[in-house]
Amino acid sequence: DVILHALECELNPIFQVMDLKGGCVHTKDDVIEQITKIFFYGAGCTSETSYVMRKALMKHFPKAEVEVDSDLLGAARAVCGYEPGIACILGTGANSCLYDGKKITQNIPPLGYILGDEGSGAVLGKLFLNGIFKGSLSEDIKEKYLKWSGLTYPQIIDKVYRQPLANRFLAGISLFIKENLKYYELRDLVIYNFQCFFEKNVLCYSSDSIRTLSAVGGVASAFEGELRACAEHFNYKIGKVIDAPIDGLIGYYSETV
């Protein structure tokens, strides 16, 4: 009776007017009739905004009991389960929280990739572009990236400052970095990004007894070795690291439902 499904498009109550018939969700009446519970976790689903998503889902799934929570709580449940810990999202963006095994007890605001999001793919991309164009990264890396991406300097500036979804473009550079970690400069860049994440976020949490950090996201899983090395530097242990929360959530709800 429990269906957990990742939508192919992002549904964010802050940035979208909710109309699930607008192409994001395709359903058949016979399937709708079988759904009795929906657990939805999404970015922007705070206590103030989650009613928008809940109302939209209830409209199209009238027989279902609907629970809407933040993507951060979903991540915490996926990687920590019922154990206390520090749970993180390290993907295109970054977020973190102190989790007591049931709920989020503290959250350092991530502030987005312009003001914050240390540890994220978008910030890693910013650091990389700064490095290749200002000269702190080698000319070899610069030439290799420009060939890999097929982009010129003006095109990159256009993507960052004029085109939509600049954060996704920046985060996409992580793929190049992952493929070229043989360059010590790039590994150092990844570690520096994680160090900033720890210094600006993890070390700010008030619990000295919780020293285990678990993470969800493509950046966390792609650079797990660097994340573990950074955590060890700050005297933290890394628990679970997964690319996407769905498997962890299935395990979580298998025990609760």
Predicted regions and their residues:
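Alpha-helical substrate-recognition element adjacent to the catalytic core
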Residues: 2, 41-47
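Residues in well-ordered beta-strands of folded domains
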Residues: 41, 97, 178
